Amino acid sequence: MAHITFDTKNIENFVADHELDEMQPLIKMADEQLRNRSGAGAEYSDWITLPTDYDKDEFARIQTAAQKIQSDSKVLVVIGIGGSYLGAKMAVDFLNPMFNNELADNQRQGVKIYFAGNSTSASYINDLVRVIGDQDFSVNVISKSGTTTEPSIAFRVFKQLLEKKYGAEAAKQRIYATTDANRGALHDEAKISGYETFTIPDGVGGRFSVLTAVGLLPIAASGADIEALMTGARDAQEEYSDSDIKNNEAYKYAAVRRILYDKGYTTELLINWEPTMQYLSEWWKQLMGESEGKNQKGIYPSSANFSTDLHSLGQYIQEGRRDLFETVVKLDNPVSNIDLPHEDGNNDGLQYLEGVTIDEVNTKASQGVTLAHVDGGVPNLAVHLPAQDAYSLGYLIYFFEIAVGASGYTFGINPFNQPGVEAYKTAMFALLGKPGYEEQTKVYRARLGK
């Protein structure tokens, strides 16, 4: 039995049983392309068996490195962007208290985790340098090539900060490079400088890399249980190995999404009801958007954080265009709970909630919102998590990964490349005057009137 539950009771008015039956041949074909490595982009599909086939020796080194970081640092600065950032950020937030970095050292499981290299904002970098201040820190720089603009800029800044604080040689012992095993600028620098290195596997694309060293080192340094994370993913790998939709809820999710898309529901909102899950949505958006958005096809991935966004997006969801559907990730058992405090009088009108916990309010709110949105014509799917722990997160990660792999093949596209991102990079490099872009520089500067 699956550890997480996929609930489709609120799409009965939108998707008929026979439509799911009719999707089965397409899902079976997609499954064969995934399992047999015969589909487009198959060279980047090693994530399918990663929970069982990962490098156990490197995993042990990750655990040792995390312990070293915890012993000599108060802060770990994780430098990366896209898949080299979102997976780790998502998991660190999900598996730790909301204000983890603000807790006293004896109340935290691991070090404070801050992220850099995920934007070109000078203010962000400067503010982070000020936050670190005199605290001991280490750096985990994550880049397959070592030449991605945003991480490379941040790495220069924090590497020099380390060297200024500890000296050039001691600084090298505080830099952990997660990069290509054999080539690239970061690989070469790490080899020359003697940084401890971890591998980004060739067969695992960035958005699928959270269960590699890309995600595991920051997650472990935060104090979370990466063994339980991998166990959850391993059990999900086994659970979602059947090509039959009736026996595979991840494939059922993929099938339902495709049916809704064909009916004009082209935007999917991932909904959470816990602030610590905000970056689950950000990670999911990259996973879905980069995998499916090709050849003028694909479901547009968006998200909302409830109940907060009900006070901004609630009106549109309820009565706006009927081209969206919701997938709610609902935590069934909160990490902690609070009873609503007693107060004499009833000035705030909350006396009727006397004896109710705040999570009960959260649950009833989510149920009420779902009913209202379904009544308003919004198909509503739900993924129920029994607990907010590492095992459940590993399970959920694999659920979404295998679902989007199959979903991509049902669209007839390559789910594992992202050719479209080169367009903006070409324009950016040309405007910055990067060598090799001289002709494009003339064109783009002329378009800007410069």
UniProtKB/Swiss-Prot annotation:
Protein's cellular compartments: Cytoplasm
Catalytic activity reported: alpha-D-glucose 6-phosphate = beta-D-fructose 6-phosphate
Q: Which stretch is the leader sequence?
A: none
Q: Name one GO biological process term.
A: glycolytic process
Q: Which GO terms describe its cellular component?
A: cytosol
Q: What is its EC number?
A: 5.3.1.9
Q: Which family does it belong to?
A: Belongs to the GPI family.
Under HAMAP family, the record lists: G6P_isomerase
**Function noted in UniProt:** Catalyzes the reversible isomerization of glucose-6-phosphate to fructose-6-phosphate.
Q: What is this protein called?
A: Glucose-6-phosphate isomerase
